[in-house]
Amino acid sequence: MDPELLELLLALDGVAQAPRYHPEGDALYHSLQVFDIARRDTDDPELWAAALFHDVGKACPDDEATHDEVGADLLEGLVPERVVWLVRHHLDLLREPARARRRHRACPWLPDLERLRRWDLAARSPTALTTTPAAAWALLQERNDPRHR
């Protein structure tokens, strides 16, 4: 995995989020919670990566685009296409769930998007103990090592 991914993750440290939607705190803490929930729910390292990097666009605000679009653009070429797609669409089921399900019904990744949405919504604890960024990175590195596939 490209070391640039770790930099994108660490850039979330201290990125404030609206307390109404994110009582847990900054974007890094939230992303680590989503990652931990994903790890408990699946052995799929691509879904772990989508969980960990779903909000990386929040560290690079853009007046023209939303954080899901910015994040997907940042991840393009660094992670598999499936991860980019999940990051790009991770808010679709929040914004317009029925429309998103219709639009993506033929996509084989829709069930993964549903899971990512659930994990994202569940990761709101201000007291959760999380994996450290370095440990999350190491787990992804290990799972993406061809010897572990």
Language-model regions, residue ranges each:
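Short secondary-structure junctions and interdomain/linker hinges
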Residues: 12, 16-19, 41, 45, ...
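Alpha-helix initiation and N-capping motif
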Residues: 2-6, 46, 80, 109-110, ...
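Generic structural signal of hydrophobic/aromatic residues within well-ordered alpha-helices
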Residues: 5-12, 103, 112-113, 136, ...
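Acidic/His-rich, divalent-metal-binding segments that scaffold phosphate/diphosphate chemistry
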Residues: 1-63
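Divalent metal-dependent catalytic cores for phosphoryl transfer on phosphate-bearing substrates
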Residues: 37-125
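Charged substrate- and nucleic-acid-binding regions of tRNA-handling and nucleotidyl-transfer enzymes
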Residues: 110-149
